[in-house]
């Protein structure tokens, strides 16, 4: 377990420091005294529902994760599967969420699952999440006429990657190109296994299932903003809330910053101001949203990582 901790310690701590800096920046932009005043008027009746919605997102994402494992003929023990998936949430503050490849390492330790297969699952999770967020954001774009350039580009890039993964010819051409050089042959062999696994995950039925799950799960996060604004005494439409969280998440993902930190918060804040909220309420809503949809998941993930350590590495302990 020390090997895992050492590998991901720096990016995790880096993400944590950036996160704290972003919180300070949002408080300053929103006027600290004004934000505190808005928080003082928070209707606590909404809090349990807000805190429940983000974990519901994780439940749906776990369903997709388990579905992909089944398609890949990987069958971890149910309890360990839950802990391994949960552990990945602790790494959402690493750049581009690449820390979620931790799940691949843990599956390797648990059932000796090939990294080429499990990494394709993590990639498929991210791509289908991206498609789901783009669909949700598109609904808002149709209603508000905002983000017309970003979304077609997002669909285009994601679609191109999925189409590329349907064909092994480019990868086999690469294999012939590198010849008998040992290192590069290993790399191309990995890519061919990765592509073969990914192709199973992107059949039309699998793609539709994963995207529908993604739309549902990210819709819950949109409801967080809707309820947070309500709790602060403001008004925003549910469609507007879904647009804010999905569009800001896309921008955060495209930034490749840890957890989209800074970009996601700035986008949420700007879009809430654009939707007509006051500066203080927009800042307070941004903080509640990011705590519920990001940092709560990180805390849950750290608990999962601790429990995985106890289960997988009893001998080391």
Which role fits each region the language model picked out?
Residues 82-112:
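Extended non-transmembrane interhelical loops and adjacent amphipathic helices
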Residues 61, 99, 131-139, 155-157:
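Membrane-embedded alpha-helical core segments of multi-pass
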Residues 1-86, 143-253, 286, 291-317:
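Predominantly cytoplasmic-facing regulatory/coupling regions of multi-pass membrane proteins
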Residues 90-95, 119-141, 287-299:
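Membrane-embedded alpha-helical segments of transport systems
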Residues 107-115, 244, 248, 266-284:
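Interfacial segments of multi-pass membrane proteins
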Residues 87-96, 245-265:
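Transmembrane alpha-helix interface/packing and boundary motifs in multi-pass membrane proteins
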Residues 78-81, 101, 113-124, 278-288:
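Membrane-interface alpha-helices at helix entry/exit sites of multi-pass transporters
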């Amino acid at each position: 377990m020390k090997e895992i901790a050492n590998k991901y310690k720096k990016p995790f701590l880096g993400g944590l420091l950036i996160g704290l800096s972003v919180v300070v920046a949002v408080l300053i932009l929103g006027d600290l005294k004004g934000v505190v005043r808005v928080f003082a008027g928070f209707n606590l009746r909404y809090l349990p529902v807000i805190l429940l919605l983000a974990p519901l997102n994780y439940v749906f994402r776990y369903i997709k994760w388990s579905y992909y494992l089944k398609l890949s003929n990987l069958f971890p023990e149910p309890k360990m599967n839950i802990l391994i998936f949960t552990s990945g949430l602790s790494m959402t503050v690493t750049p581009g969420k690449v820390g979620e490849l931790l799940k691949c390492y843990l599956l390797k330790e648990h059932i000796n699952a090939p990294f080429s297969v499990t990494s394709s699952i993590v990639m498929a999770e991210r791509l289908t999440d991206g498609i789901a967020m783009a669909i949700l954001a598109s609904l808002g774009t149709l209603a508000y006429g905002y983000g017309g350039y970003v979304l077609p580009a997002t669909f285009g890039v994601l679609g191109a990657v999925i189409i590329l993964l349907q064909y092994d010819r480019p990868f086999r051409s690469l294999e012939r190109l590198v010849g008998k050089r040992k290192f590069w042959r290993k790399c191309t062999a990995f890519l061919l296994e990765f592509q073969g696994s990914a192709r199973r995950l992107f059949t039309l039925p699998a793609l539709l299932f994963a995207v529908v799950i993604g739309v549902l799960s990210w819709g819950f996060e949109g409801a967080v903003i809707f309820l947070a604004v309500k709790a602060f005494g403001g008004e925003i439409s549910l469609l507007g809330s879904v647009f804010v969280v999905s569009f800001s998440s896309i921008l955060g993902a495209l930034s490749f910053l840890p957890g989209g930190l800074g970009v996601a918060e700035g986008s949420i804040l700007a879009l809430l101001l654009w939707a007509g909220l006051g500066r203080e309420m927009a800042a307070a809503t941004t903080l509640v949203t990011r705590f519920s949809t990001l940092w709560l998941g990180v805390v849950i993930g750290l608990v999962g990582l601790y429990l995985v350590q106890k289960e997988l590495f009893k001998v080391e302990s």
